[in-house]
Regions:
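Short polybasic/polar patches that bind polyanions
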Residues: 26, 97, 259
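Long, non-coiled-coil amphipathic alpha-helical linker/lever segments
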Residues: 1-42, 101-115, 196-203
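Amphipathic alpha-helical coiled-coil segments and their boundaries
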Residues: 3, 7, 51, 112, ...
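Internal glycine-rich alpha/beta core junctions
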Residues: 12, 22, 43-194
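Short, well-ordered beta-strand elements within core beta-sheets of diverse protein domains
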Residues: 2-5, 49, 117-125, 253-261
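Alpha-helical packing segments of well-folded alpha/beta enzyme cores
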Residues: 6, 10-13, 17, 54, ...
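Glycine-rich cofactor/substrate-binding loops
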Residues: 162-266
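A generic alpha-helix surface/boundary motif
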Residues: 1, 58, 89-90, 249-253
């Protein structure tokens, strides 16, 4: 029940973050920038298209999260080893219905922990894609690129030793927190192989990984939403970087024309 209530908060965070990303994509649908593969200039695209890719990724994780939230909506009152030896299945059915849960199809003294591990993977995926977006912002904020910057408050300080610097500290923070959520998801996987019909080795770990992961993902989504809303986009630098090597980014068009004339790719 706590997972279901916490899940509603995460869904709200996801919806708000996706909406902010859609507004950013719409604003920069015609903002020309260079696309990169392997970190190297590839072909021209728009910054709006880049953000649309992020939106698609996060919307997919939203759908995955809803599915995982539904999968873990199970309960059981089936006795010490799941045989209903001292309590009829009707009690389980009535209780679960009142709580908005589905009775587990088969259970022991507890619900199998693969349910919980699957759910934790959905949180880890959300954290990981947020890290993906944050990493891109960090790369684009590098001095020699400087296509975007995190918003910088009037009273905010840069480096304590080098005050000219504006470090992407918020995005760096998100990358670090993502590692913690992923580590928690590994713990959830390790909770699956319990002894026989149950032991409590999973219990102590779950008391940490579930509340911590929910709080971390909630924090990460809210922080990333703030980054998106306050993102400074340097359109002139995007255009400058796009034209940095002249027309070399059109090499594929030239290649295709040469192939049409009978030349080989080699």
């Amino acid at each position: 029940l706590q997972i279901q209530d916490s899940g509603k908060i995460i869904l709200k965070d996801l919806d708000e973050t996706i909406q902010s990303m859609k507004e950013l994509a719409q604003k920069h649908k015609d903002t020309v920038c260079i696309g990169r593969s392997h970190g190297i200039h590839a072909e021209i695209m728009t910054f709006g298209v880049k953000i649309c890719n992020w939106i698609d990724i996060l919307e997919r994780q939203r759908a995955n999260f809803i599915h995982a939230l539904d999968e873990i909506r199970v309960g059981q009152i089936s006795g010490p080893v799941g045989t209903y030896s001292n309590i009829p299945p009707e009690v389980e059915a009535i209780t679960c219905k009142k709580l908005g849960l589905m009775p587990a199809r088969v259970s022991t003294q507890i619900i199998a922990r693969d349910y919980h591990a699957y759910f934790m993977q959905s949180l880890a995926l959300i954290a990981s894609v947020i890290e993906q977006f944050a990493t891109e912002i960090r790369h684009l904020q590098r001095t020699e690129v400087l296509e975007v910057e995190e918003g910088f408050g009037k009273k905010q300080k840069g480096s304590s030793a080098m005050p000219h610097k504006k470090n992407p500290v918020l995005s760096e923070n998100l990358c670090g927190l993502s590692r913690v959520v992923r580590a928690n998801s590994i713990v959830a996987l390790e909770n699956i192989p319990l002894w026989h019909e149950r032991d409590i080795s999973h219990s102590s770990a779950e008391r940490i990984i579930f509340p911590d992961s929910f709080m971390l993902v909630d924090f990460m989504l809210n922080r990333f939403n703030g980054i998106v809303k306050n993102l400074v986009v340097h359109e002139k630098n995007m255009l400058k970087n796009t034209n940095k090597f002249g027309g070399i980014v059109y090499s594929q068009r030239v290649l295709l024309k040469l192939i049409e004339k009978g030349l080989t790719r080699e």
